[in-house]
Every structure is written in C-alpha cells, then in structure tokens.
Amino acid sequence: MSELVLARIQFASTTLFHFLFVPMSIGLVFMVALMETLYLVKKNELYLKMAKFWGHLFLINFAVGVVTGILQEFQFGLNWSDYSRFVGDVFGAPLAIEALLAFFMESIFIGLWIFGWDRLPKKIHALCIWLVSFGTIMSSFWILTANSFMQEPVGFTIKNGRAEMNDFGALITNPQLWVEFPHVIFGALATGAFFIAGVSAFKLLKKKEVPFFKQSFKLAMIVGLCAGLGVGLSGHMQAEHLMESQPMKMAASEGLWEDSGDPAAWTAFATIDTKNEKSSNEIKVPYALSYLAYQKFSGSVKGMKTLQAEYEKIYGKGDYIPPVKTTFWSFRIMVGAGVVMILAALGGLWLNRRKKLENSKWYLRIMIALISFPFLANSAGWIMTEIGRQPWTVMGLMTTAQSVSPNVTAGSLLFSIIAFGVMYMILGALLVFLFIREIKKGAEHDNHHDVPVSTDPFSQEVYHGISS
C-alpha cells in the first residue's frame, strides 16, 4: 500500500474509534446534569441515585475518550504535514481554543463535581456538572469549526502559498458549521439516551431495581425522542445546504450519475455500478429528493457526470467523483438507524404510559440491541461526510494526495497502525470491563458506597468498632 492509503487508514480508524466515546460523553453528561437538576427541583432521592450511577459510567467513558483523543492531533504534524503547513493558520486556531478553553473548563468542573458531593452546596454542585456538559458541547463546536472549514473554506486569504485567516468571524459563522453542529449534538444526545435506555432495559429484564431503571428508561426515551427528531430536522437542513456547498457529495449520496429531472425522486435502494457509471435495480420515492434538496416538491438535482464536467472547467483535469458506493450506503445506514431509533422511542413511551414496559420482554430485548444504533449512525454519518468530500481535504483548495507528509514511510505508518490498533483494543476492552462491572453492581451499590463514614475517633460508631 502507498503512504497515502496507509495514512488515510490510520486517520480514519483512529478517528472513528475516538468518536465512539465523544458523543457518548456529551450525551451521558447532559443526562446526568438533567437528573441532578430534577433531584433539586422534585426533591426525589431517586434522581440523585440516577445522577450518581450514570455519572460513574460517564466518568469511565470520558477518561477513555480523552486518551484516544490525544493521538488525533499528533497525526496532523506527523502524517499530514503538508496539510498542516497549508491551512495551519486557519485550522489550528479553533483547535487551540478547544484545548485551552473548552477542555480546560471540562477538566476543572469535572473535578469539582467528583469531589464536591456533600461538600459543595447542592445548587453549585449541579451547576458544576452543567458546566461540564457545556464544556463538552463547546469542545465539539470548536472542532466542528475546524472541520467545517474543510467542508466549506471561509475567512481566509492565500499568501505565499498558504491559507491565512483574515476573518475569524466568518469562520464561526460558516453556514456549514451551523447545520453540522446541531446535527452532531442531537446525535450525541441520542447516543447517551439510548445507552441509558438499553442498560435500563437489560436491568428490567432481570427484574432488578425496577423503579430506578424504569425511571431512567422513561427519562432516556423522552430525551432520545427529542434528540432523534432534532437529528432529522438538522439533517434535512444539512442536505439543503449540500446542494449549494458540495453538490457532488449530494449526487454521490443518491447514486445519481445523470441529472435527476424535475421533480427528483429519492433512491431508497440501488445497485451501484461505478465501472460503467450507472445505477440499476432502483427503488425510488417520487418527489422526495426534490423536497430533501429544496424543501419543495419540485426541482432537479445535478448528476455526477454533469458536476464532473463543471469541476474540470474550474479545477482542471482530474477525477472529482468520490467513492460512490461508500457515500451512498453510509447515508442510508445513518438515516435507517435514525428512523428505527425514533420509532423505538415512541414505542417505549407508549408502553410505559400503558404500564406494560417491564413486562414487554420482546421490546426490552430490542432496546438492548439498539444501544449500538446511535454509534452506527454517528460513524456512518461521518464516513459519508468525509468520504463524500473526496478527493479534497479542503474543498476546492487542497486534495488529499497533496496533504500527506512527503517524508513519511509506509513502514512507519504500518507499524503505528498496528501499535495504535493494539492499544485501542486494550482501551476498548478495559472500558467494556469497567462498564459491565459497574452495571452489575447496580445503583444500590452506589447508594451504600456513598454513605459517609465518620472519622471522629470519639463518635459512637467508631467507638463501638474499636471496643469490639
């Protein structure tokens, strides 16, 4: 394999693995903050137990996510130095803000939250976990600011062969950012909600701590349903924007080789033939693509062949069509998983309202399996986003082939891929082990564990302990 292919494999694999933990942390910490707030408002100890139990799982996930994220930024300098040299002035600014501001905020307030139980006033303690939640969201904002520049470069000028920032305001008001950011955050909230719902379903099947996990499930499904609808709405907005910013990605995601005609039908299924540049065995939904692209039931969508000819006039000779099969199917996996999650959330709330939830074993088993669906949807969405932008690293400015480090060797890349793979497998196994251990212990263990023990040698409890 070439250095370019190996560098892409390494970046894709490490990024996808890291992004298993990022949305989970954002979603879980939001749920924990919500639970602690409900405890303050309703004075119900059940919500306090919920905040502590799910908070333990959040901390485990957060720690592993931090470790996997450290390796990401090193790759820009080691494997993608030409990219870093060209856009570092623009791309580096939001990443620096993320590290110095957002992650710093998370680190401070997560410590106060961990060690502040029974030490800080209850409202201040709850504020700490909300600030952690805000910090995780702001981390995403700044990272997505950098990514949005790759999708739709703004706020820069080319000087001495480099992109230099000349408008920071344009960077943070990038239209791509404001359709991408809510889509990612709603997806993260759905991830945390469905994880809580799936674990709660497992416990309800076992008939363990039923009131606790039934309430956890109900809250998770309310958030999960709202998040799922938010994902759908923001995704629709993103599709509309793609028509302006990256029409080739839109065409590839539809397997659309020729212009669609007016109105445009959405292709639910197709056999993609990249060699002959055609699609067959298509199952189409009339008018749907026009609505997806223009929010009306009319309008045509340009095909990849038309766009290829247009791009050649702008950028010169080259192949500007991304990997079509990957882009096409990753989009459908993302959408399909999202639809299933929305239906599952509606079903769970209906069963809970009818007081049939804990006895619906078939549904609870489905919810355990659906823990994986948000991760599947998140990964598929990012695969579509990044693969669909190819051959560009920065849309219209720099190709992926131009971005790789000139001095990196295939041997060093292969070694680091194997080393990172082994380390990530160990981290993943450790996370699963710790999750299973905490889940088996249950919420009652956390409750007993948190009972304060007096350190006064003259207290009654300690005195009797010494006497015996």
Curated annotation (Swiss-Prot):
Binding, heme b b595: H18
Alphabetical GO biological process terms: aerobic electron transport chain
Catalytic activity: 2 a ubiquinol + O2(in) + 4 H(+)(in) = 2 a ubiquinone + 2 H2O(in) + 4 H(+)(out)
Domain of life: Bacteria
Enzyme class: translocase
Entry's EC annotation: 7.1.1.7
Cofactor note: Binds 1 protoheme IX center (heme b558) per subunit.
Pfam family, one: Cyt_bd_oxida_I
Cellular component per GO, a single term: plasma membrane
Location relative to the cell: Cell membrane
Cysteines engaged in disulfide bonds, as pairs: none
Protein name stated in the entry: Cytochrome bd ubiquinol oxidase subunit 1
Source organism of this protein record: Bacillus subtilis (strain 168)
